[in-house]
Amino acid sequence: MDLQNKPQILEHLHKSLTVTLYDCRWIPGTAKFVTLGSYARNTGCLQVYELEGPDLKTVKETEKKHSFKCGTFGASSLAERRLATGNFGGEVQIWDLENTAQPVFTAQAHASIVNAIDGCGGQAKGYGAPELATCGRDGCVRVWDVRQQDAPVAAFEPADPNNVRDCWCVAFGNSFNDNERCLLAGYDNGDVKMFDLRMNKVRWETNVRNGVCGLQFDRKDISMNKFAVCCLEAQFHVFDARTQHPKKGFASVSEKITAGATVWGAQHLPQNREVFMVSAGDGNLYLYKYHYPDQRKVKDHDGQELGVAGSVEMLNYKNISTQPVAGFDWSPDKEGLFACVAFDQAVRVGIVTKLNKV
């Protein structure tokens, strides 16, 4: 790709704050986004920002008892746009952003901090029940139906209670009809497990040898195509999920980012699933593109189908902070527009140009 046609990562707006930020999410169908974090006095901070010309306007700010760790709009309809959050007290809550005095849904999901949350089934184009998945330090992964808050609809707990691994991230996928749905979970010892929610069992598992900080399917609402797994020690892996071999599982390609920092997460572009942004612990954003191989599956000597991994190409990178980029989210409505938060207590809005040329 020549230099002229290369996508550029540009910072559009920058706002310094006095709160520690952990996550940010665009409100679907608007020019607004939500940031989630913690005030210095260990209380929760939920802020709504709006793009207004060359400025970033604070629309709403609310303080809650427990610091917020993560959030998602995945289980909410486009009409309601309700935000689901996980906090340091182990609670899952759903908020109506027009009235944040009381949550519309509360459940005690974990004994301590909710490390990650993901939602699925809320949008009109998706399939299946609107569900939230959470994971925590107790090693448990729990799935919640937003229409009932008394108990989780599924729970995957450690087999050995004496050897509990911290579960750091969860991600929904394979939700291409009303029955099928899968859930990925990543653990601090490098385990990656794929749970089949229809069968209620582990469908596949592997170990990537480094703690798993982030995971994402390229699309939630299609028959699973591929997913990214981000790790400590500057590594990430992309697994081809189309073909599962009975013994070898999914084929994968591994990549190391140059700086040697932790890879906090990978976010696939909503308008093009082959492009994804990797956020790193050195404050860099790396833009990658996945290239499929000529043949996506081959037959092994037993006649079983075996997946073939593609390759990843770094399109560009940009340093936007001196601290780790903890949260990153693409705008679902405007291609290339993104918001991100880093541990330097600042929120940034940026744009990636020329994505239509990749």
Curated annotation (Swiss-Prot):
Keywords, in A-Z order: Apoptosis, Cytoplasm, Repeat, WD repeat
Gene Ontology BP, a term: axonemal dynein complex assembly
Record GO terms (molecular function): ubiquitin binding
Pfam families: WD40 (PF00400)
Disruption phenotype: Mutants show ciliary loss with disappearance of axonemal dynein arms and diminishment of dynein arm heavy chains in the cytoplasm. They have reduced beat frequency and dyskinetic motion of the remaining ventral cilia.
WD repeats: 63-105, 109-154, 162-205, 207-249, 258-298, 320-358
GO cellular component, one term: dynein axonemal particle
SUPFAM superfamilies given in the database record: WD40 repeat-like
InterPro entries given in the database record: WD40/YVTN_repeat-like_dom_sf, WD40_repeat_dom_sf, WD40_rpt
Localization of this protein: Dynein axonemal particle
Subunit structure, as described in the record: Interacts with PIH1D1; the interaction associates DNAAF10 with the R2TP complex. Interacts with several dynein axonemal assembly factors.
Record's function text: Key assembly factor specifically required for the stability of axonemal dynein heavy chains in cytoplasm.
Name this polypeptide is given: Dynein axonemal assembly factor 10
Gene assigned in the entry: dnaaf10
